[in-house]
């Protein structure tokens, strides 16, 4: 008799996605990140749900409701800090996941890659709106600065900003709508992640060698479920260490001051995971140019499948392109550092050089390296 997991309509879907899924036998730890992102999303939705039970999206009470969660709600501080540091874990896994996709040529599955880029944008939007909710100084001024960028759009800019704000400044209406979207978007992310998986399972996973793995596949369970559980344990270990020992390591002290529209913080900056994009935005003196560069810093990922000119899929056997990849990594770390620095010499010029290099490496140097390698291999 055939097992119910292979015949039952619902169990069959789960079976084909997580149990009997044919998986390359040689995929490394870097393929764990997808399941870790799923775990991060579940943690964020669960902790967020409990926080929403006690939070009030009102300018008069938002700050004190967060303080109430931290002080008076049973284990409220744990839930709050797990949610705040969970976002950092989420973005760490996201960046590593994208890096893996770039290095091993996973972007050649175009639908999966493009939906992944949309997922990144949606996650960034969700995290930005979540940062506004505690209604501290950095929440208010971060929201003001970033939403104000819409005013750079010709003709409709000013009207658009006031429409987003729900008034003439970031106020109660803005906070309420940001809370609404922050609550809804994670479920949209979950739906997009399901579509992401759907497209991935159409072609199957790639592997480190970049060659087809059809002749050599194994079932996902038990081999990769065990491997993923190990990754999950390490992730939870890191998250709980941050939450219990250093909960404020990655947050801004300014956000412990109640939002005051009459007092501007000395340095307005977003959370660490947005600093690279913020540095690109700041390094262009023109407002519209900065906004375009900011958007393109993410959307540039979508052109990578088109600029792939190598005859090999993966970078495993391509030393010149590997150098370019690690240059890009170092460049992103430089941009992250610059984003947190004040706008003064020498940080301005470093930021401008790093911003130019970011786009240059992705659009020109990596494709050029591929052509050189093709020539060297006489292909």
From Swiss-Prot:
GO terms for molecular function: metal ion binding; ubiquinol-cytochrome-c reductase activity. Binds 2 heme b groups non-covalently. It is found in: Mitochondrion inner membrane. Gene3D superfamilies: Cytochrome Bc1 Complex, Chain C. The chain crosses the membrane at residues 33-53, 77-98, 113-133, 178-198, 226-246, 288-308, 320-340, 347-367. Coiled coil: none annotated. One of its GO terms (cellular component) is respiratory chain complex III. CDD domains: cytochrome_b_C, Cytochrome_b_N. Heme b b562 binds at residues 83, 182. The keyword Calcium does not apply. Keywords: Electron transport, Heme, Iron, Membrane, Metal-binding, Mitochondrion, Mitochondrion inner membrane, Respiratory chain, Transmembrane, Transmembrane helix, Transport, Ubiquinone. It is a multi-pass membrane protein. One of its GO terms (biological process) is mitochondrial electron transport, ubiquinol to cytochrome c. Pfam families: Cytochrom_B_C, Cytochrome_B. Heme b b566 binds at residues 97, 196. A ubiquinone binds at residue 201. Its cofactor is heme b. SUPFAM superfamilies: a domain/subunit of cytochrome bc1 complex (Ubiquinol-cytochrome c reductase), Transmembrane di-heme cytochromes. The cytochrome bc1 complex contains 11 subunits: 3 respiratory subunits (MT-CYB, CYC1 and UQCRFS1), 2 core proteins (UQCRC1 and UQCRC2) and 6 low-molecular weight proteins (UQCRH/QCR6, UQCRB/QCR7, UQCRQ/QCR8, UQCR10/QCR9, UQCR11/QCR10 and a cleavage product of UQCRFS1). This cytochrome bc1 complex then forms a dimer. Component of the ubiquinol-cytochrome c reductase complex (complex III or cytochrome b-c1 complex) that is part of the mitochondrial respiratory chain. The b-c1 complex mediates electron transfer from ubiquinol to cytochrome c. Contributes to the generation of a proton gradient across the mitochondrial membrane that is then used for ATP synthesis. Heme 1 (or BL or b562) is low-potential and absorbs at about 562 nm, and heme 2 (or BH or b566) is high-potential and absorbs at about 566 nm. Belongs to the cytochrome b family. This is Cytochrome b. It comes from Saimiri sciureus (Common squirrel monkey).
């Amino acid at each position: 008799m055939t097992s119910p997991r292979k015949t039952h309509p619902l169990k069959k879907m789960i079976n084909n996605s997580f149990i009997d899924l044919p998986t390359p036998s040689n995929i490394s730890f870097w393929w764990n990140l997808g399941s870790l992102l799923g775990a991060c999303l579940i943690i964020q939705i669960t902790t967020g749900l409990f926080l929403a039970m006690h939070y009030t999206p009102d300018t008069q009470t938002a700050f004190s409701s967060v303080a109430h969660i931290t002080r008076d709600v049973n284990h409220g501080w744990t839930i709050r800090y797990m949610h705040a540091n969970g976002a950092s874990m989420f973005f760490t896994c996201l960046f590593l996941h994208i890096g893996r996709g770039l290095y091993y040529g996973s972007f050649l599955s175009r639908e999966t890659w493009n939906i992944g880029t949309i997922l990144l944008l949606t996650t960034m939007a969700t995290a930005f709106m979540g940062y506004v909710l505690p209604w501290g100084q950095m929440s208010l001024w971060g929201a003001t600065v970033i939403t104000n960028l819409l005013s750079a759009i010709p003709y409709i800019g000013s009207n658009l900003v006031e429409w987003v704000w729900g008034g003439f400044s970031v106020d109660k209406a803005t906070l309420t709508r940001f809370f609404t979207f922050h609550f809804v978007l994670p479920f949209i992310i979950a739906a997009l992640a399901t579509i992401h998986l759907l497209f991935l399972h159409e072609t199957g996973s790639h592997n480190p060698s970049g060659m087809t793995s059809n002749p050599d596949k194994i079932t996902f369970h038990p081999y990769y479920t065990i491997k993923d559980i190990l990754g999950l344990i390490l992730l939870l270990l890191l998250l709980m260490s941050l939450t219990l020992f250093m909960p404020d390591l990655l947050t801004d002290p300014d956000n412990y001051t109640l939002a005051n529209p009459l007092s501007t913080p000395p340095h307005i900056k977003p959370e660490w995971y947005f600093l690279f994009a913020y540095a690109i935005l700041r390094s262009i003196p023109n407002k519209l140019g900065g906004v375009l560069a900011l958007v393109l810093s993410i959307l540039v990922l979508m052109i990578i499948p088109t600029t792939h000119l190598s005859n090999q899929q993966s970078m495993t056997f391509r030393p010149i392109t590997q150098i370019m990849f690690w240059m890009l990594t170092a460049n992103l770390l430089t941009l992250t550092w610059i984003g947190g620095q004040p706008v003064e010499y020498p940080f301005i010029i470093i930021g401008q050089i790093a911003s130019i290099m970011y786009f240059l490496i992705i659009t020109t140097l990596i494709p050029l390296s591929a052509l050189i390698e093709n020539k060297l291999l006489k292909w």
